[in-house]
Amino acid sequence: MEKRDELYRGKAKSVYKTDDADRLILLFRNDTSAFDGKRIEQLDRKGMVNNKFNAFIMQKLEEAGVPTQFDKLLGDNECLVKKLDMIPVECVVRNYAAGSLVKRLGVEEGIKLEPSTFELFLKNDEKGDPFINESHVVAFGWGTAEQLVEMKKLSLKVNEVLSKLFDDAGLLLVDFKLEFGVFHGQIVLGDEFSPDGCRLWDKETRKKMDKDRFRQGLGDVIEAYEEVAKRLGVPL
């Protein structure tokens, strides 16, 4: 597989074209950002940890019947993925109250949500990824009603699979965001799944083991990521 021009540079990953029109290379960088890119720092080993963590999770999801864009690891910081036509919407599943939900509704952090909630946000950094609903997605042509049904179904399936995976490792899956795209007519899970895009707390102590350590200045960010990976059995 030949790596070609950079197609897109995000806050923490770069996307490259390949000699296959249906495949891209994702490069996980050490860049770490918060507050819609207003704060950016370099954290050693982060690209490697997130790349291998993502590969591990995506393979677990594939085994459970969730179609993903992941194909294979190419090295410490790179993986080969399917080229998706991305839907510009983030799907957020919450099992416990945290983050923007606490700020938006004024509820106490850590409350268990039964049932788990499912929310949609428009991917737009300039607007701060605003909270939207299903009718917005269809009315503005960001996706179809049928695609939304499939995205919700897959999001809840991901939650079912990963909640158990993390629980077995002594961790609470507090919440997470997912992005989806279309590959040859099929809705497929895209982007990544890593501690950058989810909240993970130690089940006993409620210690934060995710990107909130960076957002809130708690320190030991990568050490926490590596601890999560170790508990799951991710080969780093």
From Swiss-Prot:
- Asked if the keyword NAD belongs to this entry, the reply reads no
Q: Which residues form a coiled coil?
A: none
Listed EC numbers: 6.3.2.6
Q: Give GO cellular component annotations, separated by semicolons.
A: cytosol
* Pathway assignment: Purine metabolism; IMP biosynthesis via de novo pathway; 5-amino-1-(5-phospho-D-ribosyl)imidazole-4-carboxamide from 5-amino-1-(5-phospho-D-ribosyl)imidazole-4-carboxylate: step 1/2
Protein's GO biological process: 'de novo' IMP biosynthetic process; cobalamin biosynthetic process
Q: Please provide the record's keywords in A-Z order.
A: ATP-binding, Ligase, Nucleotide-binding, Purine biosynthesis
Give the gene symbol: purC
Family under the similarity heading: Belongs to the SAICAR synthetase family.
**Which Gene3D superfamilies does UniProt cross-reference here?**
ATP-grasp fold, B domain (3.30.470.20), Phosphorylase Kinase, domain 1 (3.30.200.20)
Q: Which GO terms describe its molecular function?
A: ATP binding; phosphoribosylaminoimidazolesuccinocarboxamide synthase activity
What is the organism lineage in this UniProt record? Bacteria, Pseudomonadati, Pseudomonadota, Gammaproteobacteria, Pseudomonadales
Judging by the UniProt lineage, the source's domain of life is Bacteria
- Species name: Pseudomonas entomophila (strain L48)
* Protein name in the entry: Phosphoribosylaminoimidazole-succinocarboxamide synthase
